[in-house]
Structure formats: structure tokens, C-alpha cells
């Protein structure tokens, strides 16, 4: 498939496949974005994907689709955007099954994402939504939505195993520190300024560990916060639980995630490297070219490899294997 805008892509240029995926932009759905909704701006790419599926026709339409976005998709415009997207998939013949995965169950990064699998009727063997059970992958807000739309939306809610409780790796285990004095480390003036941007509780966390015999690590983002005097100030907010915050695209200076190392009488600060971001996305050892910003844009828009692997192993592979067992002519292609 060529690199055309999905809104103008011809369905005739799309090969016949068994699985079509769409991780469309979250810009207009995220609580951190413009919240214009799925019919506006970049997030309207969903409708380009829908158009292509529609134009492929019943004979060529993939039997399985997978869409992905931020969890704000569920609540965007009071749930209307999520409802409209699922009904649009229903109109193409797909019965739908939404669930949420957090990358922190697989890698040391907090990154919740909404996934929706759509299957054509001959593959639909799940629940109709009336009996959906609350779980980590289908928390209360999602199950409430499913139940409240059980008579309107065609569901096929598949029973799935529980994901891991937590990642085997910690933030510390993926860090690749350059030597002291390397240009990646911030100079003393910049570190002092950063320290003075912290809340007192985060300064206390630093101070307690400054003279530890081993290094301790945290991540940080800068966020503008209201102050007691009514003004607003850029604050450096630490995350100290051994998990990185959600990687973002570097559209502003505050979107770049900061790594903090404290111990052995030192406080050292730098940005996360491209290789460290790769590890946080489950792409250890991925060969990268280009600038740090280009890598951050790529990973900020990406889906955690381990989350997708979990879906493939526990959902897509069994689904397509079952289809083969009943004689459906399906080959594993994407």
C-alpha cells in the first residue's frame, strides 16, 4: 500500500488481507488534546479507514479488524464518539469487542490504550454484552458502557486471560547511562533550576537518596500548575515508582520525558535516550536512525510491542485458528 492520505486512498490499491489494523491519531480524543472529537482534525482518520473497508466490499473485506486509541476514546463527547465508531463497524458487518491494556503490565511504562477487535459474523463467538464481567482489561466504565448499549451495538465479547500483574523489568533495568561528564547530562546550573521547580515532597525524595550507596531513578515531566498566590508556574513532577510516564510526541518542551538519577552524593538529570524509549515500548535493540526528536515522535505515536504480542497470542491467533478448524479459508497475513 502506498503512503497516501487514508482519506484519499483507493480501496483498489489495498490487498485482500485477513486482518486490518488502524491506530488512528489521538489528537482530538485525548484529554491532553483539543478534544474536538472523532469527526474533526487528525482523529477523523478513522472515517478514512472505515471508507476503505466499505469500498472493499463484502467479498474482500477483512474478516478481522483491530483499532487502537487512547482510553479517552471511551469518554470523548460523552461517549458519543466511541458509540459512533462501533456502530460504524457494525454497519460493515463487524461485531465488536473493546478492552484496555496498560503497557506497565509488560514494560516499565504507564501507557493505557483502548483496543477494539471487530469480527465478521462467522467468527463471532463471544457474549452479546449483557453478561460482560468487570476485569482489569474491561474496567467498570467500559463494562458499564457495554451493558448500557447491549441492545444497540452488536457485541462479541470474548473471554480473555488476565494479563501479567506487572512488568518483569523496572525503569532501572532499562537505563543506559552515559559516563559522568557526557554532554547528555545537564550542567549544574540546569540541574539546580530543575530541582527548584520540584514540589517539596519530590525534593525530599531526592534529598533522602542523595547519599545512598547506589543510584535511584525517577522520571519527570514539566507541567504548568496553579500556585497558592493565583499565578501559574512550570513545575517538575517526579514519578518515583520505578515506572516511566507515558511517552509522548515532543510537540513542546514539556513533552520530553526527563530521567533523574540520584545517589552516591550526586543528582544527575538528562532526557531519556532513544534506546531507552525503545526499551520502554518493548522494542529493545531496534535499530534507529535519525535524531532524538524523530525517535520520540515515533515512539510517542506507537503501540507497545508487548501489548500487541499479547493480543496476537491470546486473541487473534486463537480466533483465526478456530476459523481454520471450521474450514474457513484464512491465512495469517496483515
Explain the meaning of each model-derived region:
Residues 4, 51, 87, 279-282:
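Charged/polar, solvent-exposed surface patches and flexible loops
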Residues 181-334:
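C-terminal target-recognition/interaction regions appended to catalytic cores
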Residues 19-21, 246:
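Short, hydrophobic/glycine-enriched beta-strand segments
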Residues 9-19, 27-239:
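Class I S-adenosyl-L-methionine
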Residues 1-11:
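S-adenosyl-L-methionine
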Residues 5, 101, 300:
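Active-site glycine-centered loops adjacent to acidic/histidine catalytic or metal-binding residues
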